[in-house]
Structures are given as C-alpha cells and as structure tokens.
Amino acid sequence: MYYGSLIHFCNPFFGKNEFSKIIQVVQFMPDAIKTDAIKTYAVKRRGKMIGIIGAMEEEVAKLKELCEDREEIQKGPYFFVKGKLSGQEVVLCKAGIGKVNAAACTQALIDAFSPEQIINTGVAGAIAEEIHVLDLLVSKDALQYDMDATEFGYPLGQIPREEDLAFPAEERMIEKALAVGKSMQGFHTFLGRVVTGDCFVSSQEKKEFLRKEFQASCCEMEGAAIAQIARKNGVPFLILRFISDEANTKAPMTYTEFERKAIAQSVDFVLEFLK
C-alpha cells in the first residue's frame, strides 16, 4: 500500500502529523482493509459539525440565541455554544479581536470539536473600489499584510518558511456562498482577497497601498490567522465579511453607523448558507 496517496486523500480531514499516528495503528492490517480503515477514521474525525467564529460577541450573539438544542461548553478561556442552526450542527465562539486571539480560538475549536468546516463571519473595511458599505465579500484567499520579512527575501505578507503567501478558501464553500449571495436581496456579493492585520485601517493612503500591493478586496483583523490555522489542520474554511466602512478617513464614523446593520445581514446570510 502506498501511503503517500493516502496522505493526499486524507489531507482535507486531518494533518500529516496526525496521519502518521494513524499509520502506526493500521500498518499491520491487511492491504484490503487499510484504506477502509482510514476512510472510516476520517469520517469520524471530521464529523458533521461546522465551526463558526466571530471576533466580537455581537458578531455571534444572535446566532447563539437562535441555536436549537443549545449547549454551552467551556474549553480553557473560550466559551463555545454547540447546537443546531438551520438544521445543521454548529459550534460558535467569540475569538476576540486580533490575529493572536483568532488563531488561538481556532485551534481550541478544532481540538475540542473536530469541525467539518470553519466559517469566519463578521465585518470589514472595503478596499476594492467597486465594494461599498453593506456589500458582502466572500474570501477567495487571505493573507497577513503586516507580516514583513522582506529583509530576508520574502515577499511582503509572506510568513517565513510557510508554503503559502495567501491561504485559499475551500472551493465548494466559495461556490455555495456566491450562490446564496446571488439569491438574497439588499446587497451585492463579491469574491476577493481578505487582508488581515492588527490595525484598524482609516486612511486613504493605507487603503490604496493595500489595494495596489496585495490586490486586496477588504481589510480586517482576524481572517488570515483563522485561515492559517484551519489550513494547518486540514480543515476547509471560508471567510465572510459584510462591509461596515470603506477604510478611509471617514471609517470610524461609518463603522459606528453601519456596524449593526452589517452584522444583522451577516446573521441572515449564515443562516441561509447553512441550509
């Protein structure tokens, strides 16, 4: 049995380190049942649960409230709500603002619940000229714009010794999100790049830089960190961002005015996406 092919098969289900542990268990099985054993484990490992992460409590509060068969579970510093939304088993969590909080929460969620997919929902600032307040951005991929190891020959945004400059979202999730967006009214849906940094962007100069340097569609503070951890664990992910401001000098005022509306739209969209 050639295990390299099994690694390729199992990559969407669990990482290579975990895969090597499973090989220790199945290596003495007859060849005829080895692949079936891997497939059975993979299904159990992934389950049918979708993890939903928001940076702020207000981004997930309504979803928590709407959960059926609700169960609250604490894992370390994180309070998860497990239940059903639109008939789909989900687990929700507030990560906290910023990349470190987002990454830590994502790993905690994966370790505790082994989700089939991860959705990061919330609000963002528009970077692309065609995207405006209350529109939806579906992530094609995500990168960390404030990662700078250019002195060592890496492109701006590249994490040293990582394979990816940008972390690509899962194609089937993208396709479904675009279809759901097309079916809903009141906003336009775009596919594009999410750029993440520990900074609230509120200057035209910074906005233009992100657009030209990274071909960014929107900017926010958590998505690429969630994407990185999901990818390391072999969990398909998608970032959904409703636009709360246009990342310019008016951004603080615009954000305050439109945040609630953008979050309400996000809740409605997630409920449709889960159906």
What residue ranges belong to the model's regions?
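A C-terminal functional module that forms or caps the active site or interfaces directly
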Residues: 200-246
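His/Asp/Glu-rich mid-to-C-terminal helical/loop segments that flank catalytic regions of hydrolases
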Residues: 247-275
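Proline-aspartate-enriched helix->loop->beta-strand connector
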Residues: 114-119
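Mid-sequence, gly/pro-rich, charge-dense loop/helix-turn segments that line enzyme active sites
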Residues: 127-214
